Amino acid sequence: MSANLNKQPDIEIFTTVNCPYCWAAKELLERKSLTYKEIKVDNRPDLREKLQNLSGSHTVPQIWIENVHIGGFTELDACENSGRLDRLLSK
């Protein structure tokens, strides 16, 4: 059996401390028992600029799963409700 069968995809989430959508996104991931790398962009204009260049958006959260840009919480929630999130996680 391959060791990669149970490997969770890499998940990165760019957040700020006082963002309720960030909290909601992290809660959704945690409900699914997923671990993620949180990148806090508070007081980090360099990271904010990088985030905007990568995502095309200046809002947080911004979420990537295995280098696939999901978007913010609204898009993550839509992926969860449609079953797309489970498909992305099973790749």
Residue ranges and their predicted role:
Residues P20, D46, G71:
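Short alpha-helical
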Residues N53-T59:
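Thiol/disulfide oxidoreductase modules built on the thioredoxin-like
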Residues L5-N6, R31, N53, S82, ...:
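Rhodanese-like catalytic fold shared by cysteine-dependent sulfurtransferases
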Residues S2-T35:
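Local sequence-structure signature of Cys/Sec-based thiol-disulfide redox active-site neighborhoods
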